[in-house]
């Protein structure tokens, strides 16, 4: 019987290099790309070869550990200067996913008091491995909590890919499908194709099929009709940043689904680890939304489909107001109701 173990890992540490599952080649080619320096890591994030907020944080952590091994520094002060430069450099790759900055800050903090280069290099490698290992445990816990929201046979709509290949393992929004299969609770996924890069059509369908989980692909425009005619029971999505009041940035089109859930009276869940929360921002209006290249919209797999010179608005994310969210599922449990109070309480513990 197929399980999540059949799904390739998104990021693997090789000691002197990083292997990333090249998600731009999926579903037709399963290819690992070798990253050997910090510039490779930056490009891999920008080009969406590695994607998903937790996976971006993981590859950034490994990227910093890798870079630190190669510094030509004569003392710890010069080492720290080079390290901080690379931290700032990686932070310019993708602005919306807060896990990137969380991982960078965690790596930076891990060597703040270290006095020798050799020890700093050792600690950075260990910390990056811990970040990856912790994410796998966290995602499994998210899946356990999320599964309590569903019952055997439920049809659940999702968008983008918040699955195993977007994390260390299991995923966030897709975690209950994997945990459910382990426990004999069969859930059926309806995956929005997720234009313009088709993360749902290319990635979510691919990884769920790898694990022998029922999945039906729909166009983004079909969501309302599918909810009505296919008796969708709930919607679950991942997140790239959740702020203090519960407002959530996620893949463009998520807000559409939240509005549809409200209209049709079905639950709308967000699944995310605590590392995706940004308590420095009070509302979603403060979130910087990444805008990507116009060719993602004007071309499909390299073929021009729109008239040349057509203006394009191509935000990668939108923000769903907290009042449209039924529950935020974390590794610590499910938040419901007064998100600001619950989130504040979580981070005070």
From Swiss-Prot:
Active site: residue positions: 240
GO biological process, one term: L-methionine salvage from methylthioadenosine
UniProt keyword list: Amino-acid biosynthesis, Isomerase, Methionine biosynthesis
UniProt-listed Gene3D superfamilies: translation initiation factor eif-2b, domain 1 (1.20.120.420), Translation initiation factor eif-2b, domain 2 (3.40.50.10470)
GO molecular function: S-methyl-5-thioribose-1-phosphate isomerase activity
Pathway recorded for this protein: Amino-acid biosynthesis; L-methionine biosynthesis via salvage pathway; L-methionine from S-methyl-5-thio-alpha-D-ribose 1-phosphate: step 1/6
Keyword Amino-acid biosynthesis among UniProt keywords: yes
Enzyme Commission no: 5.3.1.23
Site (Transition state stabilizer): 160
Free-text function comment from the UniProt entry: Catalyzes the interconversion of methylthioribose-1-phosphate (MTR-1-P) into methylthioribulose-1-phosphate (MTRu-1-P).
Classification via HAMAP family: Salvage_MtnA
PANTHER family according to UniProt: METHYLTHIORIBOSE-1-PHOSPHATE ISOMERASE
Protein name as it appears in the record: Methylthioribose-1-phosphate isomerase
Native species: Bacillus mycoides (strain KBAB4) (Bacillus weihenstephanensis)
Gene that encodes it: mtnA
């Amino acid at each position: 019987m197929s399980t999540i173990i059949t799904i390739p890992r998104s990021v693997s540490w090789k000691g002197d290099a990083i292997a990333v599952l090249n998600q731009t080649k999926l579903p037709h080619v399963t290819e690992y790309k070798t990253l050997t320096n910090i510039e490779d890591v930056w490009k891999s994030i920008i080009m969406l070869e590695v994607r998903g907020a937790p996976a971006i944080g993981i590859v950034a952590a490994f990227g910093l550990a890798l870079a630190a091994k190669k510094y030509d520094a004569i003392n710890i002060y010069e080492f720290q200067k080079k390290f901080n430069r690379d931290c700032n450099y990686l932070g310019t790759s993708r602005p919306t996913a807060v896990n990137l900055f969380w991982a960078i800050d965690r790596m930076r903090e891990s060597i703040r008091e270290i006095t020798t280069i050799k020890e700093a290099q050792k600690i950075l490698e260990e910390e990056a491995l811990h970040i990856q290992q912790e994410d796998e445990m966290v995602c499994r816990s998210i899946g356990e909590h999320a599964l309590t929201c569903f019952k055997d046979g439920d049809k659940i709509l999702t968008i983008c890919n918040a699955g195993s290949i977007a994390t260390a393992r299991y995923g966030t929004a897709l975690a209950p499908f994997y945990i459910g299969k382990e426990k004999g609770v069969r859930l059926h996924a309806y995956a929005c194709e997720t234009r313009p890069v088709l993360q749902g059509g290319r990635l979510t369908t691919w990884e769920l099929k790898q694990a022998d989980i029922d999945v039906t692909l729909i166009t983004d425009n079909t969501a309302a009709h599918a909810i009505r005619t296919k008796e969708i029971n709930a919607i679950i999505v991942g997140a790239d940043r959740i702020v203090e009041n519960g407002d959530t940035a996620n893949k463009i089109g998520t807000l559409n689904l939240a509005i549809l859930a409200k209209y049709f009276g079905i639950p709308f869940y967000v699944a995310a680890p605590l590392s995706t929360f940004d308590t420095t921002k009070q509302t979603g209006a403060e979130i910087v939304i990444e805008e990507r290249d116009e060719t993602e919209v004007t071309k499909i797999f390299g073929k021009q489909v729109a008239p040349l010179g057509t203006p394009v608005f191509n935000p990668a994310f939108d923000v769903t107001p907290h009042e449209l969210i039924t529950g935020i599922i974390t590794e610590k449990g499910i938040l419901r109701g007064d998100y600001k109070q619950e989130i504040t309480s979580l981070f005070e513990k």
